[in-house]
Structure formats: structure tokens, C-alpha cells
């Protein structure tokens, strides 16, 4: 080490940061510390070490080293490096606090710092801080930079201020392709696909990001055929290759929309480009493979997700987290527990790992393993976070251990948030714990007075308890305040197109055929033992049992499945996506439909996947 100059050490650290060589960089740090070489000149090597750790995502160490550097020896690069690294690794609040500190200590704010600040505000969708940042940029005189203006437009676009985006765009003397793309993304998000298409055709030049925005827009609208045509034009006619950022963005859009057809197209493209499977898989390859694992799991094909995972030559903790989250959604908690030892031999688990494992235990009712996992957090150098407590409360609640769940919730180091309280309220509903539910409901109403879901859940509990008068009063109060429940919406992919249904929907072009099929389905499953579960429906003076049953029959997922039965060949699996939790009646009905029609029916609701096959569900009625 003595033969190494300071310049060479600095270059080595930069090389380790650039190539993500974390272990060699740490070893070099250790040698510097023990050899005494780190002591001088301080501003030369300390800054290099800090920048290495910040670039590598080791933010705790980076912050410590940054704090050790005297203020007089910190330059703009140090401040902006820490600022951008906080943003890159999701520590957005830290970024904001650091920017405030920079202003307080009169650190020179340049265009790089402002662009980073705007990016943080865009991610947080914090309009107040965004406008403050805009004011700072005006004072600093950096709005002459196209790059800064593009970041400013993107920030306002993420916050929904479309008119402000358009105003800034019109005032730009130089409109780059990035400027156009930011406007396109904003318009597609807030004004719709039709208006976005107009902007897309107006663009004098289109980059890969602009094409990806349009592809994601069509994916969200369910236009599979148009997506494939766009991809063909983008790749084969315009020559825009899909890099790992574009591929991951498209796979994320496929996962959110449930579009398996386009997801498979992207998978084939990645294979042809020899991504993911090479012996020397890069970080980019790992991210594409991880996005595929996530996409297949969220599109209901957990077997393909597992296959991609097994074929990856290199995996990181994000890959494992994606797989565990997917397995949790599919109710395969035991598999997650069995694979955990293999994971810790490959990578170090993080907070998200334990959230996924605890979620898997919750969806599978594995209480003892869940407790062991929760208590092992500190063994891996982690402190239990709110998300971990939320999973444990959910696990105990689902298992019927309501009192134990409430005790754990009250012992949390921070007050329970809406997720934790909402989870416990749901468990109270399932297990009929009205007294505890009433306490929880009062806390939830204080947090979110406009949320109808909790009050609807309470009214259902009162009905089940035979207290319909209280339920009627609760719902009547909501109606007087003009508060409506969130409507249930279901979508199904048939013949490369998405078809959406709401409860009692009659807007579909084939409504008459769908309702004829619905009548046939109800008649056949009644003969097979189906009895409508009306226990959660509030009685009204003008309603009777027949009307209640009719309302249940027209739930959105039943309409979607009936359309699927009409439009697909026998034995074709049906995949339905619902925005809310599937109700008890639809769950019971789908089990019988799967047996009577010999169909596999997969429904992804707000919480998890339900795979109905041969008269049973993959959740084992534990959901």
C-alpha cells in the first residue's frame, strides 16, 4: 500500500464505485484506516471514501463520513453527491432535509442540486416544497438551463399541474426531445391517451422514453394489439432498442395492468438480446430478470415467475424480495419459509425481505414461523418497522388472535397508522369482534374521516350481528354527507383486449348475452349447492331477500367471469383483476363455478391471488 499514491487510491475508489465493487472498496477502506494513509491529506481521501459509499448505496456509512469532513473541506460535489444518493436510494425526506441544510449553511446551489431537488419533489408529489424549490431556482438564476426546466416541468407534471407544465414548455427557447417527452408523459397521465397521442404525433423527434410512455399508456388502457404494433414500430422500423430502463418500465406497466401477452413479448426480446442469463450478468441484466419475476407473479403466473428466478445466473436482494412478494400474493407461505435459508446464503436480507416473508406467513396462516421471523429481525441488524408490525397484526388477526394482535399494536414504538388499524378492523369483521372493531373504527375516522370503507365494514358487522337498525343509520349518515363507497371494478383480458365491468354494469356491447349467461351460471351453481350469502347486505324497507340476491349476482367479478365463459374455449383459464377485496359470496360462487364449468379461474383482488380450481381455492378459505 505504501507504493500507492493518494491519486491512485482515489482512482481505485472511483473505479470500485463505478463498477459497484463494494467489497474491494471496503477492503481498500480498511487498509487505508490501518495503514494511516487515510490521515492526510484529509480532503483528498475522505471525500473519495464518502463518494464511494454514497455511490454504492451504503448511505449510513456515507452520511457518517460526510459528517466527519469539515465544512470548509466540503465542496459542491460532496453536497450534490449526498443529495442525489439520498434520492436515488429512496431516502427522499433525507434529501429534503439536506437541501434545507445547504441553504442554511449558504452552500452554493447549482443546477445539479436544483434538478435533484425537483426530482425528489416529483417522487413525493409534494406541491408545497416543489413551489419553494421553484422559488429558489428563480433566485439562483438557473432556470436558463433546459435541463433544470425539464426537471421543473416533470415535477409539476407529477403533482398534476398540467397548465404550469404547458406554460413552462411554451416559454422554452430551446425545446429538446426530453422537454417534449415530459409534456407527453404529463398529458397521458392527466388528460388521457387520446390527447397524448396528439402530442406524440406533434413531436419533431421521439426518443425511447417517449415510445415507452405511449406503450405504458396503451397497456393501462388494455389495448394489447396497439401495444404490440407500437413496439414493432419502435424497435424494427425506428430502430430504438430497448435498454434495461425501458424494459423494466414496460414490465412494470404489464405487472400493474396484468397484461401477460405484452409481458411475454418483452421476455422474448430480452432473451434474444441475451440479457439475464449470461455467466457475467450485469446489474442491468439482474434488474430485467427481477422485473420479469415480478411481472409474471403479478399477472397470475407464479410458475413462470419461479422459472425465470431459477434460470437467473445472478440474483440480488431485490430479486429475492420480488419472488417472496409474489409467492406471498399466491398464498405460498410455506415455500417462502423453506427458501429463506437459501436466500441468506446468497444475499443479506433487508427490511423489504422481512415484510415479504411476514406477508407470506400472514396469507398462509403460519403463526409460529411468523413470530420467529419477526423476532429474528435484530439478528440481521434490522429494527422492526411499522410495515413489519402491520404484517404481524394482520397475521394474528387472520388467525383469530384478535386480542393478541391489539396488544402487539399498542406496544408498537410509534402510533399505529391507517394500514395497521385497517388490517385489524378487517380481522375483527371476519371473526365478529364488534367491541374491538368499534374502538378501532373511532381511531380510523379521526385519521381519515372521508374513507367510507371502514364505516361500510362496520355496518356489515352490525348486520351480521342482527343490528340492522344501527347499520341503516350508519349508511344513512354517509349518504347525507354525500360520501359514497368505492365502486367494485373488475377487468378481464379476452382476445388481446381488456373488458371492464362494475357492479350491475350494463354498458358492455354484449350486455344481453352476458346477463343470459349469468342467469345460466347462477342456475347451474344453485343446483350444485350455491346459496347466496346475504349476511353482509343492509336491509331496507323496500327491499327483500330476492332483491338482495339479485344484487349479489351482479357483482363485477361475476360479470367478468360470465363474459370470459362466453368468449373463450372450454378449459381456457380465466384471469380477472378486481380493485377491492373479493366478497364472501363471490368467493363461494367462484369455487362452484370452477367445478361446474371445469375452468381454472384466477382472481387478483386488492390483497392477493385466488386460484379457483375443481371447487376449491388456493387460499384454503383463509383470506
UniProtKB/Swiss-Prot annotation:
Q: Where is this region: Type DYW motif?
A: 527-623
Give the transmembrane ranges. Answer: none
- Which molecular function term from Gene Ontology is one that the record holds? zinc ion binding
**Transit peptide: where?**
1-16
Q: Where are the PPR repeats?
A: 42-72, 75-109, 110-144, 145-179, 180-206, 207-237, 243-277, 285-319, 320-346, 350-384, 385-419
Q: Name one GO biological process term.
A: RNA modification
Which InterPro entries does this chain map to? DYW_dom (IPR032867), E_motif (IPR046848), Eplus_motif (IPR046849), Pentatricopeptide_rpt (IPR002885), PPR_At4g14850-like_plant (IPR046960), TPR-like_helical_dom_sf (IPR011990)
What Pfam families does the record tag this protein with? DYW_deaminase (PF14432), E_motif (PF20431), Eplus_motif (PF20430), PPR (PF01535), PPR_2 (PF13041)
Against PROSITE patterns, the record matches this protein to:
PPR
Locate the region Type E motif. Answer: 420-495
Q: What is its main location?
A: mitochondrion
| Protein location | Mitochondrion
Q: Where is this region: Type E(+) motif?
A: 496-526
- Annotated Gene Ontology cellular component terms: mitochondrion
Q: Which UniProt keywords apply?
A: Mitochondrion, Repeat, Transit peptide
Which NCBIfam families is this protein grouped with? PPR (TIGR00756)
Q: Which family does it belong to?
A: Belongs to the PPR family. PCMP-H subfamily.
Protein name according to UniProt: Pentatricopeptide repeat-containing protein At5g15340, mitochondrial
